[in-house]
Curated annotation (Swiss-Prot):
Alphabetic keyword roster: Ribonucleoprotein, Ribosomal protein
Region feature (Disordered): 133-196
Protein name: Large ribosomal subunit protein bL17
NCBIfam families per the UniProt record, alphabetical: L17
Gene Ontology biological process terms in this record: translation
Native source organism of the sequence: Arthrobacter sp. (strain FB24)
Gene name of the record: rplQ
Subunit field text: Part of the 50S ribosomal subunit. Contacts protein L32.
């Protein structure tokens, strides 16, 4: 037995339900906001967001999948060009449902469902700008470091010879300092034992 779709039934059969959702999605993408019942808006939200996700991918296979659901080529073109670019930096949450009260004739609860096309948030825009600036600075530093690295290589080739001459002198100085440091460490320890 086929499993029924999640969410409330929209009346009619499953084919009528699919066509109704496709038409609501096409109207939403064409007009950017539509007024409908709360139940239809709640069923439309995941459907429309899934289509926007396909549009963000932007490849031919995704376009053909959306064209299989929405037959209006003009709406699909607008979805893949305008809407996908507007929500490029947004990870989900492409639609917003706002309840507007009940309908006058049959007292059905109504809602406005609209596309969220404004930028994600000012803070995230600033963070994105800062990260891009940091990348540019890092690239500049790498470019400046490349000539400096060549001169460092020449200096490091000469440095081992100088270090080899300095090494015996440093070892002799360390051996002289080591016993003096041990004696200095033993004196405070002995004083602490006497104080107890």
């Amino acid at each position: 037995m086929p499993t029924p779709t999640k969410g409330p039934r929209l009346g009619g059969g499953p084919a009528h339900e699919r066509l109704m959702l496709a038409n609501l999605a096409a109207a939403l993408f064409e007009h950017k906001r539509i007024t409908t019942t709360v139940t239809k808006a709640k069923r439309l939200k995941p459907y429309a967001e899934r289509l926007v996700t396909f549009a963000k991918r932007g490849d031919l296979a995704s376009r053909r999948r959306v064209l299989g659901l929405i037959s209006n080529k003009g709406v699909v073109h607008e979805l893949f060009t305008d809407i996908a670019q507007a929500v490029e930096n947004r990870d989900g949450g492409y639609t917003r449902i706002t309840k507007i009260g009940n309908r006058k004739g049959d007292n059905a609860p109504m809602a406005v469902i609209e596309l969220v096309l404004e930028p994600v948030s000012a803070k995230q825009a600033v963070v994105a700008e800062a990260t891009s600036a940091a990348k540019r600075d890092a690239d500049k530093k790498e470019a400046a470091a490349a000539p400096a690295a060549e001169t460092e290589v020449a200096e490091t080739e000469a440095a081992p010879e100088a270090e080899a001459a300095e090494a015996p002198k440093a070892e002799a100085a360390e051996t002289e300092e080591a016993p003096a440091a041990e004696e200095a460490a033993e004196k405070p320890a002995a004083e602490e034992k006497d104080a107890k």
